[in-house]
């Protein structure tokens, strides 16, 4: 199965659902960035690796900020939450398509 084609279609559908939302809304921005990434990559393994990294983005960011910066207002970032959620949904979508 070609993950690039499957995910590209999935993301385009998701973006069409968000067509009337501001371009900088966290979910739309994360989907747009993922679509850009898919345009640059060809390997299924690289796509899965990127999604796994993205799925932990919010947790890793909080851990890093906690260690080096005491400003708790930076811990909850809507964009990184959206990135993590979309990556998890995409991985789940790919898993369901495989079966």
What is the meaning of each model-derived region?
Residues 26-33, 37, 45, 78, ...:
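Alpha-helical oligomerization interfaces
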Residues 11, 39-43, 55-62:
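Short alpha-helix boundary/capping elements
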Residues 16-28, 41-48, 62-74, 99:
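Charged, low-complexity interaction regions
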